């Protein structure tokens, strides 16, 4: 079984970035921007309505408060402040999810925060504290071996491991930083091959050519990648052709 997720609702006002409706037709989980790196109330409500109508699970994609940098700038936010900001974002999205007859099934950090909580124990703990403060028991989605997932498990929350179809990996199993050459995999055929390999063989070829074990229950295709919807459709079709059941983890 493999979940297929994508980042959605990454626009605000009249500005749009992702083809939300097209992506919702082929993913099983939607990482919805909660207003801190992208998204606004109207966008969040529209995406939640569409996701609920299509049976797609809704996840809160929480971020540093960084609209100008699209959440891709690492920030030294005090833990108590970060906890409050995480709870705030989840709470805002939950209003629209519940109004649509659904719920916030999981929480996934975005951008720089996602990478920071792989190794930063204080920020990882603060994010999990924010999830608990918001209430309920949503799953927490993150990189295998991250401090985030360790803290989530310790808090009794479902800790779900994620892999990336269109990102390069270091030999240590972390993501190659976006500023480095080759960090994003642009060749659609390569993305499809890597996706099937991670789902079936549970491994991926790293940036140095080494084989890296991958134990993931969810696979991400970035919604802001050019042609993201068409790529997501190809990935899903290839997974199903390989005998992989594509369904939500939550």
Swiss-Prot record:
Any one GO molecular function term: ATP binding
Family annotation (CDD domains): LamB_YcsF_like
Top-rank EC class of the record's enzyme: hydrolase
Swiss-Prot/TrEMBL keywords: ATP-binding, Hydrolase, Nucleotide-binding
One Pfam family in the UniProt entry: LamB_YcsF
SUPFAM superfamilies attached to this UniProt entry: Glycoside hydrolase/deacetylase
Domain of life, per lineage: Bacteria
Catalytic activity: 5-oxo-L-proline + ATP + 2 H2O = L-glutamate + ADP + phosphate + H(+)
UniProt cross-references to InterPro entries, sorted A to Z: Glyco_hydro/deAcase_b/a-brl (IPR011330), LamB/YcsF/PxpA-like (IPR005501)
Quaternary context: Forms a complex composed of PxpA, PxpB and PxpC.
Protein name as it appears in the record: 5-oxoprolinase subunit A
Organism per entry: Streptomyces griseus subsp. griseus (strain JCM 4626 / CBS 651.72 / NBRC 13350 / KCC S-0626 / ISP 5235)
Organism taxonomic ancestry: Bacteria, Bacillati, Actinomycetota, Actinomycetes, Kitasatosporales
Protein encoded by which gene: pxpA
């Amino acid at each position: 079984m493999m979940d297929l997720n994508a980042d959605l609702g990454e626009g605000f006002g009249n500005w749009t970035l992702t083809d939300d409706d097209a992506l919702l037709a082929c993913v099983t989980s939607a990482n919805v921007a909660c207003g801190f790196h992208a998204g606004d109330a109207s966008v969040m409500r529209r995406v939640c309505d569409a996701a609920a109508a299509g049976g797609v699970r809704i996840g809160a994609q929480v971020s540093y408060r960084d609209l100008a940098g699209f959440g891709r700038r690492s920030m030294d936010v005090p833990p108590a402040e970060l906890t409050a900001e995480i709870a705030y974002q989840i709470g805002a999205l939950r209003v629209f999810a519940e109004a649509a007859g659904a719920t916030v099934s999981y929480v996934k950090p975005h951008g720089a925060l996602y990478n920071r909580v792989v190794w930063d124990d204080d920020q990882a703990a603060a994010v999990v504290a924010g999830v608990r403060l918001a209430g309920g028991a949503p799953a927490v989605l993150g990189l295998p071996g991250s401090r985030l997932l360790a803290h989530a498990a310790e808090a009794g929350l479902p800790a779900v491991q994620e892999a990336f179809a269109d990102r390069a990996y270091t030999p240590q199993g972390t993501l190659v930083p976006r500023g480095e050459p080759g960090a994003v995999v642009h060749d659609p055929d390569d993305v499809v091959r890597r996706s099937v390999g991670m789902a079936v063989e549970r491994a991926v070829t790293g940036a140095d050519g080494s084989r890296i074990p991958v134990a993931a229950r969810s696979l991400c295709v970035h919604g802001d990648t050019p042609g993201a919807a068409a790529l997501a459709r190809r990935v899903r079709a290839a997974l199903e052709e390989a005998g992989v059941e594509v369904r939500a983890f939550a």
